[in-house]
UniProtKB/Swiss-Prot annotation:
Domain of life: Bacteria
One GO biological process term: nucleobase-containing small molecule interconversion
Protein name: Cytidylate kinase
Alphabetized UniProt keyword annotations: ATP-binding, Cytoplasm, Kinase, Nucleotide-binding, Transferase
Annotated InterPro entries: Cytidylate_kin, Cytidylate_kinase_dom, P-loop_NTPase
The protein's enzyme class: transferase
Amino acid sequence: MADTKQKRVVVAIDGPAGAGKSTIAKGLASRLGFIYIDTGAMYRAVALWALRQGVDSGDMHRMEQLAMAAQIELGPGTISLNGEDVTQAIRTPEVSNGASKIGVIPGVRRAMVAKQREIGERTSVVMEGRDIGTVVFPQADVKIFLDANPDERVRRRYQEIRTKEDPPPISQGQLAAEMKERDMRDSTRADAPLAQAPDAVYLDSTALSIAEVEEAILKIVRSRVTNGRDFS
């Protein structure tokens, strides 16, 4: 846990799907003693609720209502929605696609950003998503834009799906098409599009191991945030 007697620190990790944000952010948070915040999981939780309620993702008013009413709690490696553990339920292609669609709705984004800021203003965090360094915490102490080439991102995401469902419910070709569409939607949406913050460090993880990426980011944190802390 972060030491509340010291200045809280925000490490923002942005990037497209499949770049390795979640894996890296979890490991980094553990090493730093910070709280890990998966903002994408928050959007997924709202998308799951919408699917269960039969609410069309295009119904902006209803989606905004759901986002504002959703009781989302994040724990170590878990997420609950209205008191129910939905950690596994949100990790399906259908929910992932829905999350990307509702992520372009301004009212939904406002509700999620408010929840994310409230967490980050309480304690030190490693927060990953698509607009953390540009919108949620533009004054983050450390900003990383984590990327990988499209083929590698598809391969990683497909392997992730296969570990949960074998045979997977989607082919690798279908996943590639969905991810390409999502990349386009995320980078061209009018409200908080996926973009590298001007002061973010760009890191291509295509040919790097998890340990190598973690160490590279940890080195950046050490150089920018001393604050009497020992980031070993």
